[in-house]
Design a protein with these regions (language model features):
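An acidic, low-aromatic, low-complexity terminal/linker signal
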Residues: 1-155
Length: 155
């Protein structure tokens, strides 16, 4: 029997952090909002910017730049907050420099990073798109790490 290639098309929201392009699985994205006043929370992690009130819902907001130890935040007119609502977890916002178009990437055009690779923690792979290469974020791992840090801080 011939090998059947997995030709499933996945959709990602294309975002920019500095000069780097990333993709966020569209199934996690609940909303994209303009940058607004973020209320700081005392004694929080450096990458935790604070909380916002979005239509009556208090949402924690993190800086992906700080989480990935990139250059400091440079909020500008194109900065946005990506509101993510993963299954069975609390809603969270990530500040990004820019939000681009929806990227359609075939499963066969994704080079997955091996689990032994240190980069694999927050990146699931690299997608090949007509507009260039895109690092695909592992949102589940990002949120799991955040929850683990909260638990450790509580103990």
């Amino acid at each position: 029997m011939a090998d059947v290639k997995n030709n499933e098309i996945k959709q990602y929201i294309g975002i920019m952090l500095g000069n780097e392009r990333y993709g966020v699985d569209i199934s996690y994205v609940d909303n994209i909002v303009r940058l607004q006043k973020i209320t700081r929370v005392p004694k929080a992690q450096d990458y935790f910017l604070g909380v916002i009130n979005l239509r009556g819902e208090i949402i924690p907001v993190m800086s992906l730049r700080r989480k990935f130890e990139l250059e400091p935040d440079g909020f500008g007119p194109k900065s946005r907050i990506l509101i993510l609502k993963p299954e069975a977890q609390a809603t969270v916002g990530f500040v990004v420099d820019e939000v681009h178009e929806v990227l359609n990437i075939s499963e066969e055009d994704i080079d997955h990073i091996g689990s032994g690779d240190e980069k694999a923690t927050y990146i699931t792979g690299v997608g090949k798109h007509a507009s260039g290469l895109v690092s695909l974020l592992n949102i589940a791992a990002l949120l799991a790490a955040e929850n683990k840090e909260k638990e450790n801080a509580a103990n």
